[in-house]
Amino acid sequence: DRLRSRGLGDVYKRQAEELNVPIIIQTSLGTAEYIGFEPLIAAVKALAEKSSVNVALHMDHCKSIEALKKAIDLGYSSVMYDGSALPIEENIKNTQEVVAYAHAHGVSVEGEIGSIGGAEEGVVVEKDAAMYTKPEDALHYVNETHVDALAVSIGTTHGQFKSKAKINYELLKELKAKLGPVGLVLHGGTGVSDEDMKRCVREGMKKINVGTELNKNYIEVVSKTFTADDVTPLTSLRNLLGPANERIKEIVIDKASLFKL
């Protein structure tokens, strides 16, 4: 999930508590820079301190090693270094630097091998450049970097919401068998059907990213609410944003139920 405002962060936290599940609040580098690292982290820490479930703050798809070190220093509990567009040995070298720094600070690291097509904030991969993760490359990468989690490309696409992904389950099974305890991560979850989502979890996926669906629904509801006939300059923004937050809450509940084994 993504943190667009403190209001949304509180929505995620409250729903996680109701479902009694841990939660990952995930941001892009752009979001952290827009809000400001310090106020963003302080807001999430305040939510976490009052929460009855575990709360992680994760930096998604970051290509800057220095930015990740800053995130680690200021309080992120998990980061993702994305060197998937680089030659594999350069990706490994850079990931090793991030892992060494992160683990020394008690922070977990997600890496990526194989390019997931599509576009989202900070990530654009042309369809022709996207490729499935090669199991032998994934094993080499994991053995050399010691990442805690690995984003793999098995048929999903960033930003996909008009059609459903075709998951390569044979590849998923092979990756799980080769990589053992390393947590497999599925990006592009919006394009995955409910049945495929549940099967991916059964087959070993430990983290599934869903961003586009949240963004799309939030924008649709906000657009409708802000243009309603009864809106005036005196209308409270809290009241205008409330329906969108409720819609996000519904999606969070739905996805959390799919992710449970």
Label for each model-derived stretch:
Residues 193-261:
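C-terminal alpha-helical cap/extension of soluble enzyme domains
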Residues 25-31, 146-170:
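Glycine/Thr-rich beta-alpha phosphate-binding loop at enzyme active sites
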Residues 19-71:
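Active-site cofactor/substrate anionic-group-binding motifs, chiefly glycine-
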Residues 33-41, 63-70, 84-110, 160-173, ...:
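Active-site-adjacent beta->alpha loops and helix N-cap segments on the catalytic face
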Residues 23-27, 55-60, 79-81, 109-111, ...:
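Hydrophobic faces of well-ordered beta-strands that scaffold small-molecule active sites
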Residues 83-159:
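Conserved anion-binding
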Residues 77-89, 154-159, 203-219:
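Glycine-rich phosphate-binding active-site loops on the catalytic face of alpha/beta enzymes
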Residues 1-9:
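Single conserved hydrophobic/aromatic residue that forms the stacking wall/gate
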